[in-house]
C-alpha cells in the first residue's frame, strides 16, 4: 500500500497542473489562435503574452457553424507584441497575468462569423456583460425563427367568451 501511495504521489508530481487541462480539438486550437491574434491587436497591449493554460473549452455545433468558448490564462513575456508568435519569447516570472474569455463562431468552411475576446487582469475575472456578448456570438448566423421553445405559442390567442 505504501509503495502504491508513493508511486501515485510521484506520478501526480510529474503530471502537475498541466495534466488537468482539457485536450483541445482542432477547432478549439484554431479558435485559441484567433483569440491570441485578436488580443495582440489591441493598442493598450505593449508586450507579448503567452498562453499558460486553458481552464475550460467548449464546442457547440449549430446549423450555421461551430461555436467555441474558451477560458484561458496569459502571462506577459519579454518580447514586444508584434513578436508574440516567436518561440524565443520567454515568460517574465513577475509579468502580468490575464484571465481570458473568448467566444468564437466559425462557419463549416472555417470563416469567422463572430468573436469576442475579453482578457482582464487576473484579479478581476469575467463579468456578466461578457457573458451576454458570448451568447450573442453563439447565435450569430442562426435563423431566429429556426427553433421554438415548448409552450411558446400556447397562449398566443386570447380566449373568446360568448
Swiss-Prot record:
Assigned GO CC terms: extracellular region; extracellular space
Keywords, sorted A to Z: Chemotaxis, Differentiation, Disulfide bond, Inflammatory response, Secreted, Signal
Superkingdom of this protein's organism: Eukaryota
Gene Ontology BP terms: brown fat cell differentiation; chemotaxis; inflammatory response; positive regulation of chemotaxis; positive regulation of fat cell differentiation; positive regulation of protein phosphorylation; regulation of insulin receptor signaling pathway; regulation of lipid catabolic process
Keyword Chaperone: no
Disulfide bonds listed in the record: 79-89, 100-119, 103-134
Residue span(s) of the pro-peptide: 157-162
Induction: Strongly induced during adipocyte differentiation.
Main location: secreted
Signal peptide: 1-20
Subcellular location field: Secreted
PTM annotation, UniProt: Secreted in an inactive precursor form, prochemerin, which is proteolytically processed by a variety of extracellular proteases to generate forms with differing levels of bioactivity. For example, the removal of six amino acids results in chemerin-156, which exhibits the highest activity, while removal of seven amino acids results in chemerin-155 which has slightly less activity. Some proteases are able to cleave at more than one site and chemerin forms may be sequentially processed by different enzymes to modulate activity levels.
Tissues with expression: Expressed in the differentiated adipocytes (at protein level). Abundantly expressed in the liver, adipose tissue including visceral, epididymal, and brown adipose tissue.
InterPro entries: Chemerin, Cystatin_sf
GO MF term list: signaling receptor binding
Annotated function: Adipocyte-secreted protein (adipokine) that regulates adipogenesis, metabolism and inflammation through activation of the chemokine-like receptor 1 (CMKLR1). Also acts as a ligand for CMKLR2. Can also bind to C-C chemokine receptor-like 2 (CCRL2), but with a lower affinity than it does to CMKLR1 or CMKLR2. Positively regulates adipocyte differentiation, modulates the expression of adipocyte genes involved in lipid and glucose metabolism and might play a role in angiogenesis, a process essential for the expansion of white adipose tissue.
Protein name per the record: Retinoic acid receptor responder protein 2
Organism: Mus musculus
This protein's encoding gene: Rarres2
Amino acid at each position: 500500500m505504501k509503495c502504491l501511495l508513493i508511486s501515485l504521489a510521484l506520478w501526480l508530481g510529474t503530471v502537475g497542473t498541466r495534466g488537468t487541462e482539457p485536450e483541445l480539438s482542432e477547432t478549439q486550437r484554431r479558435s485559441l489562435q484567433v483569440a491570441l491574434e485578436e488580443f495582440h491587436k489591441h493598442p493598450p497591449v505593449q508586450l507579448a503574452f503567452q498562453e499558460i493554460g486553458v481552464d475550460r473549452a467548449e464546442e457547440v455545433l449549430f446549423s450555421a457553424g461551430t461555436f467555441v468558448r474558451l477560458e484561458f490564462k496569459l502571462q506577459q513575456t519579454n518580447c514586444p507584441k508584434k513578436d508574440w508568435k516567436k518561440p524565443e519569447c520567454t515568460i517574465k516570472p513577475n509579468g502580468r497575468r490575464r484571465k481570458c474569455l473568448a467566444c468564437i463562431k466559425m462557419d463549416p468552411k472555417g470563416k469567422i462569423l463572430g468573436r469576442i475576446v475579453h482578457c482582464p487582469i487576473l484579479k478581476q475575472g469575467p463579468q456578466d456583460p461578457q457573458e451576454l456578448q458570448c451568447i450573442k456570438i453563439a447565435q450569430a448566423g442562426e435563423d431566429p425563427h429556426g427553433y421554438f421553445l415548448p409552450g411558446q405559442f400556447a397562449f398566443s390567442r386570447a380566449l373568446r367568451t360568448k
